């Protein structure tokens, strides 16, 4: 789907979001690694300063986890670090097409993949519960490069061309991506498993709206 075809029905806010992500993608690929990481961390700090609702939610959640008041200095410092790390996540994800997969392989220590190997060797396929820990995009790209037939489900973002942007990138490194709400989604995932594939599902986020 082209950018022109995808603009139908977009609000101006959605258009700004789309081009913001496109600019971020370009920047991540163009900058040297060390410079990009530092710049995105600064961007994370800026987001903490201006995104009042997200900042308030982060402070409230971390205060509960740490057993401190939301205004506590430790809670605030931890929240700022979380925003920096989230910005780093986007840098690493968008930089993937510009990074050698062998350099990623050299930095990954794979633990527990023998369980996948046994399941696939037996022709059973499997479903893997994953969490938003580290960078799932990097791990998925690495696993696909290693030959694991990975499929996953992603939230159908708006505007549509933003979803397609992420879909093209992930499918570009070998991960099949199914959008939420797609007719026959469960059947397609089950078919992927029956074909001796691996379905990776984020188990720490509920997209149903029911908590």
Pin down the residues of each PLM region.
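Membrane-anchoring hydrophobic helices of lipid-metabolizing enzymes
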Residues: 2-130, 163-168, 172-175
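Soluble catalytic domains of membrane acyltransferases
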Residues: 97-211
């Amino acid at each position: 789907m082209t950018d022109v075809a995808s603009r139908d029905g977009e609000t101006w806010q959605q258009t700004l979001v789309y081009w913001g992500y496109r600019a971020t993608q370009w920047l991540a690929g163009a900058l040297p690694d060390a410079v990009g990481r530092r710049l995105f961390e600064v961007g994370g700090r800026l987001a903490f300063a201006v995104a009042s609702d997200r900042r308030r939610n982060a402070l409230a959640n971390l205060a509960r986890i740490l057993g401190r008041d939301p205004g506590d200095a430790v809670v605030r410092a931890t929240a700022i670090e979380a925003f920096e790390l989230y910005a780093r996540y986007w840098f690493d994800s968008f930089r993937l097409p510009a990074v050698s997969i062998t350099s990623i392989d050299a930095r990954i220590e794979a633990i527990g993949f023998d369980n996948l190997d046994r399941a696939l060797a037996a022709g059973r396929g499997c479903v893997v519960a994953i969490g938003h820990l580290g960078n799932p995009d990097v791990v998925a790209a690495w696993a696909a490069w290693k030959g694991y037939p990975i499929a996953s489900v992603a939230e159908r973002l708006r505007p549509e061309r933003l979803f397609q942007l992420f879909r093209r990138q992930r499918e570009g490194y070998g991960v099949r991506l199914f959008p939420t709400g797609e007719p026959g989604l469960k059947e397609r995932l089950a078919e992927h498993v029956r074909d001796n594939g691996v379905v990776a599902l984020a188990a720490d986020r509920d997209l149903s709206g029911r908590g």
